[in-house]
Amino acid sequence: MMNKLSEEEIQDKLKKFDGWTYAKKSIHTSFQFENFKEAFTVMTRIAFEAEAQQHHPNWGNVFNELEISLSTHDADGVTEKDFKLARAIEDIVESTN
């Protein structure tokens, strides 16, 4: 099991993640895409990465907007696993722009 990070550790790590915030035991972000197809394409790529990492986002999609929250349920908070997936998500989104 991964160790839960302290709020100070989380805030420090978030400095490397533009547009991500910490609230309610999770890290959160949102993205806006050109259209639904682009949003869904990114979601599909994230889904494959999440499956490979065996760590899955809590997310929502309305048309061209995607909201993502990450936390580690077993640790009841944020762990390194969340930041690893967040980095992969950032890389996926950047590669589509």
Swiss-Prot record:
- Main EC class the enzyme belongs to: lyase
**InterPro entries, alphabetized:** PCD_sf (IPR036428), Pterin_deHydtase (IPR001533)
The coiled-coil segments of this chain are none
Q: What reaction(s) does this enzyme catalyze?
A: (4aS,6R)-4a-hydroxy-L-erythro-5,6,7,8-tetrahydrobiopterin = (6R)-L-erythro-6,7-dihydrobiopterin + H2O
Keywords, sorted A to Z: Lyase
GO MF: 4-alpha-hydroxytetrahydrobiopterin dehydratase activity
Pfam (any one): Pterin_4a
Q: What is its EC number?
A: 4.2.1.96
One GO biological-process annotation of the entry reads: tetrahydrobiopterin biosynthetic process
- Looking at the record's lineage, which domain of life comes first? Bacteria
Q: Which family is this sequence assigned to? A: Belongs to the pterin-4-alpha-carbinolamine dehydratase family.
According to UniProt, the name of this protein is: Putative pterin-4-alpha-carbinolamine dehydratase
